[in-house]
Regions:
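Metal-dependent nuclease catalytic cores that hydrolyze phosphodiester bonds in DNA/RNA
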Residues: 1-123
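Cys/His-rich finger/ribbon microdomains and the adjacent scaffold used
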Residues: 10, 182-209, 213-289, 316-318
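Conserved DEDDh/DEDDy metal-dependent 3′-5′ exonuclease domain
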Residues: 75, 90, 94-105, 109-120, ...
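Acidic, Mg2+-coordinating catalytic module of metal-dependent nucleases/exonucleases
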Residues: 165-227, 238, 247, 443, ...
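Metal-dependent catalytic core segments for phosphate chemistry
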Residues: 316-377, 420
């Protein structure tokens, strides 16, 4: 049998999902065949962005006038151990920076992005500290720190001195430093249990965050479907699996058979009933006609309420309504992302908001300045449209568009008070919240693309969902191909049209017992004057007292808005539990 190799990345994977490491070992031993990579172009995009970040870090070291040793690449014909032997001891040469240094130490192997030569100013003692370049922007992740711990341990074995510090060069450009002794005990604890990492003990796949980036996602997905795993029921959470399994409920079929009034230790009775109802709907969807939309049922309102909690969030349709969707590139630059398309659907009109045809609008932003301009113009457009038609609303699916617009308005310092007024007076309507609190549907996911079939919506453009839009935009950045932008716009137009179709379908299902949500709440304050004051102060330019004062104006309104959003999110979580 081929000897199993341990790497820092394997230990990181093991922390996230034991089964992922089991499958990796099975792949290396030939027990399972290579798996088609599920993320394809997007995974390559991320890898390329990582290499770009490394190259930028390397260039920065050179720009500082430091002597840099680039380790020759590993030859195809040599093993990792032979590569390490060929590299020898690069520390003896006294370079300030060593790039891509391979280590093999105590059964673990890995390659450090950078190793820095450090001289103690008081004693003159020389030591070496590892630096890893990561696309993460805000702080180190546990796996990143563990990799650095291995490099530090390997450096100590070669030089006799444990690095006092380890470093991460984040995608944001920040240089995060970690005291080695603060984290090394945990690394050594993990290493002491490495036998369990290398064992052939049976593991079971459990859904976790690692699934989103795992090379073996399709392997586990096939197994779960073959087993009819209970977590395929929409709304079943990881914390529900243990009590369900303890009660012998391990499949969708078994959960669907749970009768009303049943009790299960560790699960709220109302929640158990809701999960069982969801499983029953999904089972019915499997046995129904292939082209038929999935079955659904309205959720009965709690005692004392006249109508569904979901439908109570739905306002009466208006000719001024707008349907909104954004597309963004999270890794546009290592230092930050970019929202490059702001798309919406509305009725064009001559001023009164009535009678026009539904038209799709696409506004592009190819740099941060343009992003700020589009955000400001969009907020002004929505505010002006709502002034003319107070009954209009901005519909979106999931909270992303509203929360993104709030974040971008703060980031660019544009339209914050106007947006606060729109949010505070209920202009934004999240259709996912309406559906989640108002009905159950026989689908595994409540994403837009799974629910638009209820309205009979048929898509025209499919570019692999959101990640596909990112890849297509990357193609545009590489070659300026207009066709890439056209495909993204067609995809985005599908999203807003599907959102409108779903809204119209919800209105058709509405019972007269449900009340329309109030169209508008009268704000206590008019933001126009304050907005003008802010603009006048901003004109003094960054760094001035006036510019700082502009940022402070409206502070309490923004804080109150954020407080309300947090409270509503918690309330929705309780209602959905």
């Amino acid at each position: 049998m081929t000897a199993r190799l341990l790497t820092p990345s394997k230990i990181t994977a093991w922390l996230s999902c034991e089964h992922a490491l089991t499958l990796q070992h099975q792949l290396e031993s030939g027990a399972i065949a290579p798996v088609a990579q599920p993320f394809g172009s997007f995974a390559r995009l991320l890898a390329n962005k990582g290499l770009e970040h490394e190259a930028a870090c390397l260039a920065a070291y050179r720009a500082q006038g430091l002597s840099v040793l680039e380790i020759p690449d590993r030859k195809r014909s040599e093993t990792f151990a032979e590569w390490v032997e060929r590299v020898g001891d690069p520390f003896a040469e006294g370079h300030d920076v060593i790039y891509q240094l391979p280590f093999a130490h105590d059964g673990v192997r890995g390659v450090a992005d950078f190793v820095l030569r450090v001289v103690d100013e008081e004693t003159g003692q020389v030591s070496y500290e590892p630096v890893d370049a990561k696309l993460a922007r805000s702080e180190a992740k546990p796996g990143h720190v563990l990799q650095l711990c291995f490099y530090a341990e390997a450096i100590e074995a070669l030089t006799g001195t444990l690095p006092a510090q380890m470093h991460l060069w984040l995608g944001s450009g920040e240089f995060e430093t970690i005291r080695t002794n603060d984290v090394m005990p945990y690394w050594r604890h993990l290493r002491s249990g490495s036998n369990s990492l290398m064992s052939e003990a049976e593991t079971t796949p459990i859904p976790c965050d690692h699934c989103e980036i795992c090379d073996f996602a399709s392997v586990c997905e096939d197994r779960w479907r073959a087993e009819d795993a209970v977590h395929l029921v929409a709304g079943v959470r990881t914390v529900d699996l243990a009590p369900l399994e303890a009660a012998g409920i391990e499949t969708v079929e078994a959960l669907a058979e749970v009768s009303p009034g049943s009790e299960l230790e560790g699960v709220d009775p109302d929640r158990l009933l809701r999960m069982a109802s969801q499983a029953e709907l999904q089972r019915a969807a499997r046995t129904g006609p292939g082209e038929a939309p999935p079955p659904f049922r309205l959720i009965e309102p709690p005692d004392g309420l006249p109508g569904s909690l979901g439908y109570e969030q739905l306002p009466e349709p208006d000719d001024g309504d707008v349907f909104l969707d954004f597309e963004g590139h999270p890794f546009w630059r290592p230092s930050g992302g970019l929202f490059f398309l702001f798309g919406w659907l509305c009725r064009d009109d001559a001023g009164d908001g009535a009678g026009g045809a539904w038209t799709y609008h696409a506004r592009w932003a190819h740099d941060l300045d343009e992003e700020g301009e589009q955000v400001g113009e969009l907020i002004e457009y929505l505010a002006e449209r709502r002034r003319r038609r107070p009954g209009m609303h901005v519909y979106h699916y999931n909270h992303t568009e509203r929360s993104t617009l709030e974040r971008l308005a703060r980031q660019h310092g544009v339209g914050e008070l106007l947006l606060d007024e729109l949010v505070g007076t209920g202009a934004f309507v999240d259709l996912l919240a309406v559906i989640r609190d108002g009905m159950q549907v026989g689908v595994e996911s409540y994403g837009l693309k799974h629910l638009e079939v209820l309205a009979g919506y048929q898509r025209g453009e499919d570019i692999g969902q959101g990640a596909g839009a990112v890849v297509a935009y990357e193609e545009f950045m590489a070659n300026g191909d207009q066709d890439s932008l056209d495909r993204i716009a067609d995809y985005n137009a599908d999203d807003v049209r599907a959102t409108r179709a779903l809204r119209d379908w919800l209105v058709e299902q509405r019972d007269d017992a449900h009340h329309w949500r109030d169209a508008e709440l009268d704000p206590d304050e008019q933001p126009e004057e304050l907005e003008a004051r802010v603009a006048a102060l901003k004109a003094f330019g960054p760094g001035t007292d006036e510019h700082l004062l502009a940022d402070l104006l409206g502070y309490w309104q923004r804080e109150w808005s954020a407080h309300k959003v947090q409270r509503m999110s918690r309330l929705m979580g309780l209602l959905g539990s």
